[in-house]
UniProtKB/Swiss-Prot annotation:
InterPro entries: IspD, IspD/TarI, IspD/TarI_cytidylyltransf_bact, ISPD_synthase_CS, Nucleotide-diphossugar_trans
Enzyme class at the top of the EC tree: transferase
Lineage: Bacteria, Pseudomonadati, Chlorobiota, Chlorobiia, Chlorobiales
Protein name as it appears in the record: 2-C-methyl-D-erythritol 4-phosphate cytidylyltransferase
Family to which this protein belongs: Belongs to the IspD/TarI cytidylyltransferase family. IspD subfamily.
Site (Positions MEP for the nucleophilic attack): R164, K222
Biological pathway: Isoprenoid biosynthesis; isopentenyl diphosphate biosynthesis via DXP pathway; isopentenyl diphosphate from 1-deoxy-D-xylulose 5-phosphate: step 2/6
Stored PANTHER family: 2-C-METHYL-D-ERYTHRITOL 4-PHOSPHATE CYTIDYLYLTRANSFERASE, CHLOROPLASTIC
Organism: Chlorobaculum parvum (strain DSM 263 / NCIMB 8327)
SUPFAM superfamilies linked: Nucleotide-diphospho-sugar transferases (SSF53448)
Keyword Cytoplasm: no
Length: 246
């Protein structure tokens, strides 16, 4: 099975309140940077053949050095991201399309992951890739723990309460067969359409495509705010403890 992964890692961490536009991927958790954890997970995933990373221009060389020094041989390209996350992914897909044309080999699946989700596990990546290749699309998600309500007629009041049993919190990596993901992004670029995730684009342009759910644990958080760092430390410690028990 051949899988190609895209990692979107251009976030500057405004909500992290980092100085000088520092990338949140360079925050350390458990003695390693966030992006190190993410790179390692994809390096260790048996299904993944090549990884394309989009990041800030001043993070390209540090990321390349990190990959070299740690033997992350699956990191194929590290390029400058675009203005929006979707633009960054499109930049990576342009390179993937070129590779497909030159090699004549079509991947079984393309995965798109947030660089700031460092606790994804290699075996989870492999399973999402497998389901994506078999069914066309797969997205990891968790059941919400809290009750969710609509905002009412003004931001100061609530509207109706949503049925929590029918809700899922969506995460990454999101996986798709290459043809549909590439075409969805191509059409979105032509139409000037932006979405918050890749699944939304596939839903829009291929409504007949069912997107399969991979139910994820609560460890696969996105490092977004300062409070996420100590939570991440605890998650990492828990993951290490479980692995040592096995």
């Amino acid at each position: 099975m051949k899988t190609v992964a895209i990692i979107a890692a251009s976030g500057v961490g405004k909500r992290m309140k980092l100085d000088g536009g520092m990338s949140k991927q360079m925050i350390e958790i458990g003695g390693h940077t966030v992006i190190w954890h993410t790179m390692k997970a994809f390096q260790d995933a048996e299904s993944v053949d090549a990884v394309y990373i989009a990041t800030k221009s001043d993070s390209i060389e540090p990321f390349k050095q990190l990959a070299r020094e740690n033997g992350f041989t699956k990191i194929h390209s590290i390029i400058e991201g675009g203005k929006e996350r979707q633009d960054s992914i499109r930049n990576c897909m342009d390179l993937i399309e070129e590779e497909i044309e030159s090699s004549g080999v079509m991947p079984d699946a393309i995965l798109v992951h947030d660089g700031a989700r460092p606790f994804i596990q290699p075996e989870e990546i492999d399973e999402i890739a497998r389901i994506s290749a078999e069914h066309g699309a797969c997205v990891p998600a968790t059941k919400p723990k809290d009750t969710i309500k609509y905002i009412g007629r003004t931001p100061e009041v609530f509207g109706e309460t949503l049925d929590r049993s029918r809700l899922l919190q969506v995460q990454t990596p999101q996986g798709f067969t290459p043809a549909k993901l590439i075409e969805a992004h191509r059409k979105a670029a032509s139409d000037g359409v932006y979405a918050t995730d890749d699944a939304a684009l596939v839903e829009r342009y291929f409504p007949e495509q069912e997107i399969h759910v991979y139910e994820m644990g609560y460890h696969n958080i996105k490092i977004t705010t300062p409070e996420d760092v100590p939570v991440g430390e605890a998650i990492l410690a828990g993951l290490k403890a479980r692995k040592s028990e096995n």
